[in-house]
Amino acid sequence: MRLWKSMAWGILLWHSQSGALCPAWPPARAAEEITRLQQQLADWNDIYWKQGVSAVDDSVYDQLSARLVQWQRCVGQDVSSTPVSPPLNGTTMHPVAHTGVRKLADRQAVEQWMRGRSELWVQPKVDGVAVTLVYQNGKLTRAISRGNGLQGEDWTPKIRLIPSIPQTTQGALANAVLQGEIFLQREGHIQQRMGGMNARSKAAGMLMRQDNASALNSLGIFIWAWPDGPANMPERLSQLAKAGFSLTKKYSLAVKDASEVERARQSWLTSALPFVTDGVVIRMAKEPASQYWRPGQGDWLAAWKYPPVAQVAQVSAIQFSVGKSGKITVVASLVPVILDDKRVQRVNIGSVKRWEAWDIAPGDQILVSLAGQGIPRLDEVVWRSRERSKPVPPDSHFNSLTCFYASETCQEQFISRLVWLGSRSALGLDGMGEASWRALHQTHRFEHIFSWLALTSAQIANTPGFAKGKSEQIWRQFNLARRQPFTRWIMAMDIPLTQAALQASGDRSWEQLLMRTEQHWRQLPATGERRAGRVIDWRDNPQIKTLSRWLAAQHIPGFGS
């Protein structure tokens, strides 16, 4: 598949500002796009926290929230109003504020953060809903949603119905404030293989709905903070385990460097766990007194998240490619994203009809993942830009019998045919990729797909961009091609037969091929009535006949008299 020459680029140009990619929008459009995305996130957020229903995948919501913040920073807008936390409906104050956790981008950032810090521990970053548990005189008296970190909703009635959360405590925990994650319990969850499964939304939904008390049995608790608890981490973990919060001790490891953090992170990513995770949290055993905890100021802990299985990517352009058979394929160019260490900047949408059904235009946000063999795959459109500037696809008059000869309208299918004939399925011209064919064609103006046979070594050497070694290699490859058997040349001419069928036919010359009837073709392996008819149409095509005579003049095996 080759890129259509008159491909339409979107109006989105990009520049760097403070290390981020910013859309070069006019001020009015920037304000409109930011407002629309902000409102959509707010609507999703409201549904999520009020009704317990997830209208969008957790990962998509998180990535679009980050995209909104990026856009706001690009235009110098205040980001404090971004709806990345639950709407503040509750008025119950947290005894100790939730600080949140700083995100570290990679191992280098982890190493830098760990430098100068001691008594460090790593825990899985459990994907659920944050909560404060308050125990007084040995009894659970209050449970408060995270809210804005300072105050949230009173969840006490629901939390009392969750069997996995201890309702009574003893000793130091008899009067304590705990912070943790309410999560959807899983059996043998392998994060790398199973992904997030919208576990956060499901847990939130169970807590929000009024008619599903039995569903609360499937929720668990992972305590990640005991403000003003024992200074010694092993002692803290031991007391939590004795009180019924056993997961914290089981999944807390002392670490000395980033290598140990990385090993734990990889182990938890690939091992069976009782919960969904989205990374790891590194924390110091020594914490400030709880009176100093403030939202956004927890510098004694940091998170190293897993890369998402799918990334939200912005469409920068829509391109069209025409294959050797004349099929038009639509490709979306993307502002590059990283998926599993792979830089993804293009994704195949499919046919023009499929593109029209997807309704994708430059500026849209799409969800991209990696399919088999690391091929980028379009999963869904998660956000559409207000401006719908779409390119016009090329005419659909191309087919399997067009563009054996070069013309202005045939450029892309013609190049596709050259790439095909140079592939291992045809003549096997090593080192001849699309760029080399384009350079030769643009310089020497091929008349047809075999015009390269008439090039001299001097002409090849004078092709712009060809070094001496490359031009000599191409010259050798072109000469070796002349010795290829007849069947290889027929494949290069794109006969509509498989190699197995062509070998079974026994034809070793053009003269033999001309004598074959449709009945003969129909009897070959994987060749029915329809394909046999296509072979006859191909053989009788005027351009194919002319090419066969030209190959005969070049003394190609099987084409001479």
From Swiss-Prot:
Active site: K125
Entry superkingdom: Bacteria
Family matches, as Gene3D superfamilies: 5' to 3' exonuclease, C-terminal subdomain, DNA ligase/mRNA capping enzyme, Helix hairpin bin, Nucleic acid-binding proteins
Keyword field: DNA damage, DNA repair, DNA replication, Ligase, NAD
One Pfam family cited in the UniProt record for this chain: DNA_ligase_aden
Annotated family: Belongs to the NAD-dependent DNA ligase family. LigB subfamily.
Role: Catalyzes the formation of phosphodiester linkages between 5'-phosphoryl and 3'-hydroxyl groups in double-stranded DNA using NAD as a coenzyme and as the energy source for the reaction.
Name by which UniProt lists this protein: DNA ligase B
Organism: Salmonella dublin (strain CT_02021853)
Gene name of the record: ligB
